[in-house]
Amino acid sequence: MGARASVLTGGKLDQWESIYLRPGGKKKYRMKHLVWASRELERFACNPGLMDTADGCAKLLNQLEPALKTGSEELRSLYNALAVLYCVHSRIQIHNTQEALDKIKEKQEQHKPEPKNPEAGAAAATDSNISRNYPLVQTAQGQMVHQPLTPRTLNAWVKVIEEKAFSPEVIPMFMALSEGATPSDLNTMLNTVGGHQAAMQMLKEVINEEAADWDRTHPVPVGPLPPGQLRDPRGSDIAGTTSTLAEQVAWMTANPPVPVGDIYRRWIVLGLNRIVRMYSPVSILEIKQGPKEPFRDYVDRFYKTLRAEQATQEVKNWMTETLLVQNANPDCKQLLKALGPGATLEEMMTACQGVGGPAHKARVLAEAMSQVQQPTTSVFAQRGNFKGIRKPIKCFNCGKEGHLARNCKAPRRGGCWKCGQEGHQMKDCKNEGRQANFLGKSWSPFKGRPGNFPQTTTRKEPTAPPLESYGFQEEKSTQGKEMQENQERTENSLYPPLTSLRSLFGNDPSSQ
């Protein structure tokens, strides 16, 4: 568990593991929270060894408390864990983290020094209303002093420009680094940018346009200024070209103040928006999800391009609600439309999480195959080639259906399966009733039948008795035979048989 796991032992460890993380929750503090707190202290450049005692925890709490208002969630979690650890070291009975924070707050109020006279209290109240934003800091004498930007801040700004060029995330980074800066500080940040001089020239043009517009909307008052009154800043004063650092500080700390630093920042942000638009020529309308692209990557590209769009927040919200679903691939679009128009981004990400995976691809392939097979089946049915349900197989050995003769369990029947006689097979059977094809050959049922062979059915002979004979039928048959013989004699007398060609051609060459 590491060296910091031995901070608590015995009864203190039992008390630590009995405290709930949240009021009414089920999770409690464990040893891993101590290890995490020690690592976080090292990350914040604090001494983890102070966690061993109550006084050390108090020092850490006093050091972290001023950063709670602007700190991250990790910093708040670290402060809460140290507050609980302080109560455990001090043997203060608590049940959850909120009770520990309340105990710490009570102790701080008890040790808070009271003002000696009402005037000091009023002065403290007045000082609390004065802005102490960096880089303008108030001294002990009540004077506002300017502190220039640190090299670390300038280095971070230059590194962002070198790595990100002018991507959409440069603007939030500039806003964070230039918080409370004067126009001179902002010019210092812009002058540290070595490359991208074309972009810097575009930025200067935007600043000049905004300065000219400021001069048109804020004309110079007529007449001399009263003694001791500051002059109104011009556009060039706000840009820091015709004003000194003392004048800028005086404008920013006057009553009422003139925020020349914030105004200049707003002009710079307008110019950066144009530069980002130039460096990101892709329109939000062109961001479409690929057929195999995960929905998460598509959303990342969509919002990154949306940040570069020069539009109001209402227009961006409309783009998100409409184009995000409209430009998705057909698979994701079908799922997103099923969610409805009021779906959140988390619900969309969850619904489209499996799209593009192996399971989804297999399902899509199965649906495509089924759609291809359906029209093929209908075509065969229309042409008459669709046989429908197959006839059940029949055994030639026992005559039952459901199996073949080679799988029949009945005793093997010998001989021909057609006539029952032995000595030949069914394909060689020559008994009467055998069908023949148009070539006169016997047709075997195991071979294909010619398509032009008419199918005949075997009919049974009638069982009625034969007709009675009265004598005239035999006479009629004999008379027919005599007439046929007389006709043949007549034909022979008219056309004698030609034994040679002499009667036709005279001398027959063949007889010579």
Curated annotation (Swiss-Prot):
Coiled-coil regions listed in the entry: none
InterPro entries in alphabetical order: Gag_p24_C, Gag_p6, Lentvrl_matrix_N, Matrix_HIV/RSV_N, Primate_lentivir_Gag_pol-like, Retrov_capsid_C, Retrov_capsid_N, Retrovr_matrix
Q: Where is this region: Dimerization/Multimerization of capsid protein p24?
A: 279-365
Question: What ranges does the record list as Basic and acidic residues composition bias?
Answer: 473-491
Tell me yes or no: is Cytoplasm among this UniProt entry's keywords.
Answer: no
Where is the stretch described as Interaction with membrane phosphatidylinositol 4,5-bisphosphate?
A: 73-77
Superkingdom field: Viruses
* TM helices/strands, residue ranges: none
The answer, when asked if Zinc-finger is one of the entry's keywords, is yes
The name this protein goes by in its record: Gag polyprotein
Q: Which species does this protein come from?
A: Human immunodeficiency virus type 1 group N (isolate YBF30) (HIV-1)
